[in-house]
Design a protein with these regions (language model features):
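Short, well-ordered alpha-helical
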Residues: 1-76, 98-100, 216, 231, ...
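Residue-level signal for inorganic ion chemistry
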Residues: 7, 20, 193, 223, ...
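A short helix-breaking turn/cap at a secondary-structure junction
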Residues: 33-36, 162-240, 244, 303-306, ...
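Short glycine/serine-rich loop segments
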Residues: 83-197, 398-404, 410-413
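Flexible, acidic loop-helix segments that line cofactor/substrate-binding pockets
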Residues: 221-222, 226-227, 258-271, 318
Length: 448
C-alpha cells in the first residue's frame, strides 16, 4: 500500500494536524516515541527524524544529556531533500544515547513497545519504530550502525530499510561510527520505502563517502540461509522462520543452506571497530562548544572535564573507555587493524554468495524481551542480540526487515540482505511479500 500517495490524494479535514498532535501527545507519554514534537506542523506528509540527525532550529541531542540544548544551525542533506519534496517534520524521535543500545532503554525516557508496553521497542532507533507503528500516515528517517533500524522495526512490526553504505548522504548525522553509519527509513510499506529512496539518494558534495549510482529493481529467486546464524536463534523464532521459509518456497523461491564460518567473528569485529570510532567521535563533546555548558572555570582541568563527562550515560562511558584502549599505540595493530582485515574477509565471503542470491534470516534472535529483562542483561548479552543484523551493517550491504509473523501478539520479522547497491531489488522483494502477508497495527493515529 502506498500510504504517501494515498495521503496526498485525500482531502484533509479542517484541524487535521491539530487533532493529530493532540492524540499523539497522549500516546507519546505512554510509549516514549518522541523527544520533541513539532507543534508548528500544519501541512505536508508527516515524517519523524531520529534525534541524532540534525534539523535546523530543532533541539538535537542524540538522547544524551551532554547535548542538551544544542540547536543546529543547519539541516542534514537527507532532511533538506525530503522537505523540498513535501515532507514535514513531525518531531525528533527517541533513541538509545548516541545509538548505543539494542533495546531503546539507554536514554532518559525508556521507549516502550506499542504491542506490549512492558516490553522493549528495540534500539537504537526505538522512537522511529514506535512512531511508525502508531501513526498511519507517517515515515521515519532513522540511522543504523549495527542494526539500529532493523531491530526496532522487527520488534514493533514495521518495515525497516538500511541502504548500501554511501547511498544516502550522512551530512548532518551525529556519528557513532563513521565507517558503519547509514541513514535509512522506516514505514508501513515497502512501496513508501521506494518513494523515500527515490527522493534521498545521490552524491552530496558535503559527504565524500556518498555516491551516484543507477539502481535496478531486480529481485532474486534464490535465498540463502547461513547456518552459523540459523543455529543461534531462539526455538520459537526458529519455528516461525521455518514456516516463513516454507511459504517462500511454495511461492517459487529456491532456498539453500550454506556455511560462512567467518561470520562468527562479526560481533567482536564490529564492536572493536565501532568502539574505536565512537571514542574518537565523542571526544568533541567537552562542555565548551556543543549542548551542555560547564561554566565554572575556577576548577582544575581534570575536575572540569570530570564534571562535563558525567553527562554521558553508562554505555557511552563504556564505549569511550574501551574504544580509547583499542586505539592505543601499543594495541592498535593487535585489535583495530586486525578487525579491519577480518571485516574485509567477511565482506568478500558474503559478496560471493550475494552475486546470485539474497541472504535471509530472522531479524532478531528472540521476541522483544520485557524492559525488566533487558535491564538485567550484561553488556555481552546485549551485544549478542545484534548477531543477525551486524553482518550486513559491518559490510555496508543493504537490508530490509519485514514483519513476518506474530507470536503471542508480538511482531517478529525477517531480514533480507542484498549485495552492494541491490537496494531496490530488496524493496521489490518487500513489495511482493506484502501482496501475501498482511501487517497488523494496534494504532492508526491520523487516519482519514
Amino acid at each position: 500500500m502506498k500510504y504517501i500517495e494515498e495521503f496526498l490524494k485525500k482531502e484533509k479535514p479542517s484541524g487535521y494536524y491539530n487533532q493529530l498532535l493532540e492524540e499523539l501527545g497522549g500516546l507519546n507519554r505512554k510509549f516514549g516515541a518522541f523527544n520533541f514534537i513539532n507543534k508548528q506542523i500544519s501541512a505536508g506528509f508527516p515524517m519523524s527524524v531520529k534525534d541524532n540527525i540534525c534539523v535546523r532550529g530543532m533541539e538535537t541531542t542524540a538522547s544524551s544529556k551532554i547535548l542538551k540544548g544544542y540547536i543546529p544551525p543547519f539541516s542534514a542533506t537527507v532532511i533538506k531533500r525530503l522537505e523540498k519534496d513535501g515532507f514535514s517534520i513531525l518531531g525528533k524521535t527517541n533513541m538509545d544515547e548516541f545509538g548505543f543500545g539494542s533495546f531503546g532503554i539507554n536514554s532518559e525516557m525508556p521507549a516502550k513497545n506499542p504491542f506490549d508496553e512492558t516490553r522493549v521497542a528495540g534500539g537504537s532507533s526505538s522512537g522511529a519504530a514506535i512512531a511508525t507503528a502508531i501513526l498511519k500516515y507517517h515515515v521515519a528517517v532513522a540511522e543504523s550502525t549495527g542494526g539500529s533500524i532493523a531491530a526496532p522495526a522487527s520488534f514493533c512490526g514495521v518495515v525497516g530499510f538500511t541502504p548500501t553504505y554511501g547511498l544516502i548522504s550522512r551530512y548532518g548525522l551525529i556519528d557513532y561510527s563513521n565507517s558503519l553509519d547509514k541513514i535509512g527509513f522506516m514505514s508501513r510499506s515497502s512501496e513508501d520505502i521506494r518513494t523515500l529512496m527515490g527522493k534521498s539518494i545521490g552524491k552530496d558534495p558535503a559527504d565524500t563517502t556518498s555516491v551516484d549510482v543507477v539502481l535496478n529493481n531486480v529481485s532474486k529467486q534464490r535465498l540463502v540461509i547461513v547456518d552459523e546464524l540459523y543455529s543461534k536463534i531462539d526455538k520459537n523464532i526458529k519455528s516461525s522462520f521455518d514456516n516463513t521459509v516454507k511459504k517462500l518456497s511454495s511461492a517459487g523461491f529456491k532456498i539453500e543452506h550454506l556455511s560462512i564460518p567467518e561470520i562468527d567473528y562479526s560481533i567482536p569485529v564490529y564492536y572493536i571497530i565501532s568502539m574505536a570510532e565512537a571514542s574518537t567521535n565523542l571526544a568533541k563533546f567537552t562542555g565548551f562548544k556543543y549542548g551542555l555548558k560547564v561554566d565554572d572555570f575556577s576548577k582544575g582541568y581534570n575536575d572540569f572535564f570530570t564534571e562535563a563527562r558525567e553527562a554521558f550515560g553508562e554505555e557511552a562511558k563504556r564505549k569511550i573507555l574501551l574504544g580509547t584502549f583499542i586505539r592505543g599505540a601499543s594495541v592498535r595493530s593487535k585489535y583495530y587493524e586486525k578487525a579491519l582485515k577480518i571485516r574485509r574477509v567477511i565482506k568478500d565471503k558474503m559478496s560471493s554468495f550475494l552475486k546470485d542470491s539474497f541472504i535471509i534470516s530472522p531479524t532478531m534472535p528472540v521476541i522483544a524481551p520485557t524492559i525488566k529483562e533487558a535491564q538485567s542483561f550484561t553488556p555481552l548479552q546485549n551485544y549478542s542480540m545484534d548477531l543477525l543484523t551486524i553482518p550486513s551493517n559491518l559490510c555496508g550491504f543493504p537490508s530490509i526487515s519485514l514483519p513476518s509473523d506474530y507470536l503471542n501478539g508480538l511482531p517478529v520479522g525477517i531480514q533480507i540482505t542484498g549485495g552492494q547497491f541491490e537496494d531496490m531489488g530488496l524493496v521489490s522483494f518487500g513489495e511482493e511479500w506484502e501482496k501475501s502477508f498482511k501487517y497488523n497495527f494496534k494504532y492508526n493515529l491520523g487516519d482519514l
